[in-house]
From Swiss-Prot:
One of its GO terms (biological process) is isopentenyl diphosphate biosynthetic process, methylerythritol 4-phosphate pathway involved in terpenoid biosynthetic process. This is 1-deoxy-D-xylulose 5-phosphate reductoisomerase. 1-deoxy-D-xylulose 5-phosphate binds at K124, S150, E151, S185, H208, S221, N226, K227, E230. Pfam families: DXP_redisom_C, DXP_reductoisom, DXPR_C. InterPro entries: DXP_reductoisomerase (IPR003821), DXP_reductoisomerase_C (IPR013644), DXP_reductoisomerase_N (IPR013512), DXPR_C (IPR026877), DXPR_C_sf (IPR036169), NAD(P)-bd_dom_sf (IPR036291). It comes from Shewanella sp. (strain ANA-3). Catalyzes the NADPH-dependent rearrangement and reduction of 1-deoxy-D-xylulose-5-phosphate (DXP) to 2-C-methyl-D-erythritol 4-phosphate (MEP). It is an enzyme of class 1 (oxidoreductase).
């Protein structure tokens, strides 16, 4: 029986994780649920899953949850960063699902890694912001790191065991790997007229053709910044060198990524676009459990198509690839800028095409400095957010 902490319990990954746990009740126990401020959602989850601890990042939300929880459930409600770190590092905890969206997930995820936990990584920003520090912490603590993102999980499944066992430190070429093919659907605007992108609304951007996701990730998919962040994450997870990582547009989202070997072989991982599949894989690795996902029906799949990304249509993807080549400081800046820009777009403050412009302005103007600690990363993140908010006024 694995005791699990779910960071981001009220989000889409949290919901999928709890669904997999419910399908395998003899193997997993919800030790703690963590959310930001969604009191009613957390209350419902507590009643259903009976965790030992419910943690709310927002202190007022914690008080509201405490007042609403039936006392007979005997659930401890906590709040505060120190309490959260204590929770993910507790000796009772075996596995941490790291699914808090954005930079907010970095500190608790890194704490779980340093404590040597089995970390299921759905928070791509942790590696985007602190890749080298994160990988070194994993190595030092002996933590088990398993990628939840459908693409990275697909790549992981297509790799040899010696690479799987050495994430972040592997040598792809020595294992006969030519390159990794990171697939992406292209989002809802893949075939839209370029001239129409400036007028696209948040509702349109959030209508992904294949996946069910939260608003921030949905917008990132529409700009393909999501694929850009995944590109950066893959660079750290799989220790890719120049030209070992390529992005391929695959609109059907049936092939979740591929690995091409030196002998010309290509191994692909396929399945219905449902996050419960990679979540179940990570939870049970190296075994297999029920995910609740229907098996892929090849007679209904139809045509599978592929194309190169159009960087005129997806400038955010180009920015992410360029930032990855520049290094850790640039990717930290880009991530912070993008979070501010996407939130502004979702609130109707800027247009869809302004997201890339805010990102580009920050990437070119925010001073980069060497980062040797988590405090350095947080400081650069904060500095970038201030500059990004200043840029918003230019596009309002």
């Amino acid at each position: 029986m694995q005791n699990m902490v779910i960071l981001g319990a009220t989000g889409s990954i949290g919901a999928s994780t709890l669904s997999v746990i419910s399908a395998n009740p003899d193997a997993y126990r919800v030790y703690a649920l963590v959310a930001n401020a969604s009191v009613d959602k957390m209350l419902a989850l507590c009643v259903t899953h009976r965790p030992q601890v419910a943690h709310m990042v927002d202190s007022q939300a914690a008080l509201a949850l405490q007042a609403k929880l039936p006392p007979e459930l005997n659930i401890q409600v906590t709040s505060g960063e120190d309490e959260l770190i204590a929770l993910v590092t507790a000796t009772e905890v075996d596995t941490v699902m790291a699914a808090i969206v954005g930079a907010a997930g970095l500190v608790p995820t890194l704490a779980a890694v340093k404590a040597g936990k089995r970390v299921l990584l759905a928070n791509k920003e942790a590696l985007v912001m602190s890749g080298e520090l994160f990988i070194e912490a994993t190595k030092a603590s002996g933590a088990t790191l398993l990628p939840v993102d459908s693409e990275h999980n697909a790549i992981f499944q297509c790799l040899p065991e010696e690479v799987q066992a050495n994430l972040g430190r592997c040598d792809l070429a020595a294992s006969g790997i030519s390159h990794i093919l990171l697939t992406g659907s292209g989002g809802p605007f893949l075939t839209a007229e370029l001239a129409s992108l400036a007028s696209m609304t948040p509702a349109q951007a959030c209508k992904h053709p294949n996946w069910s996701m939260g608003p921030k990730i949905s917008v990132d998919s529409a700009t393909m910044m999501n694929k850009g962040l995944e590109f950066i994450e893959a660079r750290w997870l799989f220790n890719t060198q120049k030209d070992q990582l390529k992005v391929v547009i695959h609109p059907q989202s049936v092939i979740h990524s591929m690995v091409q070997y030196r002998d010309g072989s290509v191994i692909a991982q396929m399945g219905n676009p449902d996050m419960r599949t990679p979540i179940a894989h990570c939870m049970s690795y190296p075994q297999r459990i029920r995910s609740g996902v229907e098996p892929l029906d090849f007679f209904k799949v139809g045509q599978l198509s592929f194309c190169e990304p159009d960087f005129n249509r997806f400038p955010c993807l180009a920015l992410a690839i360029a930032a990855c080549a520049q290094g850790q400081e640039a990717t930290t800046v880009l991530n912070a800028a993008n979070e501010i820009a996407v939130e502004a777009f979702l609130q109707g403050q800027i247009g869809f095409t302004h997201i890339a412009k805010v990102n580009e302005a920050c990437l070119s103007s925010v001073p980069k400095r060497a980062m040797t600690s988590i405090d350095d990363i947080i400081a650069l993140d904060a500095q970038t957010r201030i500059y990004a908010r200043e840029q918003l006024a230019k596009f309002a």
